[in-house]
Amino acid sequence: MTAKGLRRIKIKKRIRKYIFGTAERPRLTVFRSNRQIYSQLIDDSTGNTLVVASSLGITEKVSKKKIAYRTGVLVAQKAKEVGIRSVVFDRNGYLYHGRVKELADAAREEGLKF
């Protein structure tokens, strides 16, 4: 693993001590690969994943930031269908910049509170 990857995992473990999702306020976690972006709402008290959204279904040729924005809209819409309005944001060790920020901003604009 690269030094950058090890740094992210170290930050992720440090942050996870303080971030905990419940059924009323689940944890919105983000995973970013080179091509795709994934997000899920997790209830840490039971270990269940409540909602999943990813960029795998988006086939348009647009920028990665626009794809992340659409994924944020998608996860917020799915959360509303389940009845979730408030979440705890877990950036998973990534910097709050670029695609991670776009996903978070889109989820906020669609009505999720965090």
Curated annotation (Swiss-Prot):
<keyword id="KW-0687">Ribonucleoprotein</keyword>
<dbReference type="GO" id="GO:0022625">
    <property type="term" value="C:cytosolic large ribosomal subunit"/>
</dbReference>
<dbReference type="GO" id="GO:0006412">
    <property type="term" value="P:translation"/>
</dbReference>
<comment type="function">
    <text>This is one of the proteins that bind and probably mediate the attachment of the 5S RNA into the large ribosomal subunit, where it forms part of the central protuberance.</text>
</comment>
<dbReference type="InterPro" id="IPR004389">
    <property type="entry name" value="Ribosomal_uL18_bac-type"/>
</dbReference>
<keyword id="KW-0689">Ribosomal protein</keyword>
<comment type="similarity">
    <text>Belongs to the universal ribosomal protein uL18 family.</text>
</comment>
<dbReference type="GO" id="GO:0003735">
    <property type="term" value="F:structural constituent of ribosome"/>
</dbReference>
<comment type="subunit">
    <text>Part of the 50S ribosomal subunit; part of the 5S rRNA/L5/L18/L25 subcomplex. Contacts the 5S and 23S rRNAs.</text>
</comment>
<protein>
    <recommendedName>
        <fullName>Large ribosomal subunit protein uL18</fullName>
    </recommendedName>
</protein>
<dbReference type="Pfam" id="PF00861">
    <property type="entry name" value="Ribosomal_L18p"/>
</dbReference>
<keyword id="KW-0699">rRNA-binding</keyword>
<dbReference type="InterPro" id="IPR005484">
    <property type="entry name" value="Ribosomal_uL18_bac/euk"/>
</dbReference>
<dbReference type="GO" id="GO:0008097">
    <property type="term" value="F:5S rRNA binding"/>
</dbReference>
<keyword id="KW-0694">RNA-binding</keyword>
